[in-house]
From Swiss-Prot:
The lineage of its organism: Eukaryota, Viridiplantae, Streptophyta, Embryophyta, Tracheophyta. This is Cytochrome P450 81C13. It comes from the Eukaryota. Keywords: Glycoprotein, Heme, Iron, Metal-binding, Monooxygenase, Oxidoreductase, Signal. GO terms for molecular function: heme binding; iron ion binding; monooxygenase activity; oxidoreductase activity, acting on paired donors, with incorporation or reduction of molecular oxygen. PROSITE patterns: CYTOCHROME_P450. Belongs to the cytochrome P450 family. Gene3D superfamilies: Cytochrome P450 (1.10.630.10). The gene is CYP81C13.
Amino acid sequence: MANFISFFILFSALFFLFKRLFFPNRKQKLPPGPPSLPIVGHLHHIKTSLYQALARLSNEYGPVIFLRFGCRSFVAVSSPSAIEECFTKNDIIFANRPKSMATDRLTFNYIGFAWAPYGQFWRIVRRFTVVEFFSTNCLGKSRPIREEEIQSILRSIFKITKMKSEKIDLKHWVSVFTFNVLMRTMADKWAVDEEDSGVEKGKEIMKELREIFFTNVAMNVCDFFPIFRWFGYKGIEQRMINLHNRRNEFLQGLVDKVRINKKSGFVRNKESHRSLIEAFLSHQDQDPEFFTDDLIKSVLLIMFVAGTETSAVIIEWAMSLLLSNPDVLNKLRIEIDKQIGNKRLINESDIPKLPYLRCIINETMRLFPPVPLLLPHCSSEDCKIAGYDIPKGTVLFVNAWATHRDPKLWDEPEKFIPERFENMEVEKEGYKFIPFGIGRRACPGTSMGIRTVSLALGAFIQCFDWKKVEEYELNTSYDYRITLQKANQLEASCSPRQDFFPILSQL
């Protein structure tokens, strides 16, 4: 009997998929796409990273393409006009996120603002987070934390290189910097203490943090063929449950620590930064049913995933590109020396006076957007894009990678040319440059991210001389997990600039 039921379920699922794939609603005018196969749909066309495969298919079939992966329907867009239509006329329709096995298990039941359904709850949580963490006032109060943490990294690198030029694992140091900045602003503690940051203990801590927060949790075969999920295919879901338990334990520990400090009667100077957890707990006292610990943990999770590795990746790619383009590096150094001199370190108030630095960051994000496929959206009702019918429940992919490298939009798109941004008002360029997303679900932390990246990159170029390690092949190959990372971590030979010995010695 059990075998019959299993066979019946499998037969029904296959029949349903076959019907959807080969007998769609003939009245619908779906976007073009490649030939499909029974059951699997278009999965056989995805032989590289998804963003690269979609870019290749878009070159062949146009900037709006329709795909089916098993039982799920997808539309991928890569032209500014199609992207604009998605997030203006259809903005509310695409304001939701798709559900998947990963989001079922890893988002605290969809209550964080990145994955919560569009509506009043989402608006309240997002608005609260923006006001308490990303507002101009809050960024001003947290500025000392970012400046102290970059000084800590400079101090650590100087200790290693002050006697002679040494090889530096730059990815490690920028990751320590971004994690410590986020940890201090959210939880009033360090991820890695300075004395541990350059030794094995610090490296083990960073390895554990990456395992907790950056395990690949994209859609998988169980999302396309739900029958595999019922049978626990390859233990994928159980591994996600185990990962969630690790995350939950870590994040709950942060919340409990701040709660204990708060109950101890600690009084903060009104002008100093208040941690995000402390802000949430203050509101939890007034409305415990809304501001639950799970809500706090869900927001912390989003911050760690979206705010640490993305910034670190941008810094690492920028340094890699600068080492490959020494003329650009020298031009940036001249700008920094002219505006700041050699008597003090760069600080955040200097950033608006360094336009070429911002051009370099923009060009880095154009070539290597930290998230090449923006977080997916899902249509809440039938709609149209570029005259094509998009059914309700279709998952939307916005391919920033393809848009940023489109030769119709950019001259010599494969080349690193920061000067292309010198006379460009990015805000007026429409939808051709979208490294932080677009629409109602755009990243609220753009300003903080730019400050963090600008400060670190400016300080590295101001204080140290950098050279490519001879035996290290400086290439631009990449590895796509949650973010677009370098396939090989950047190692560079580093030595303090002679004029900055006095300043670095006094840090």
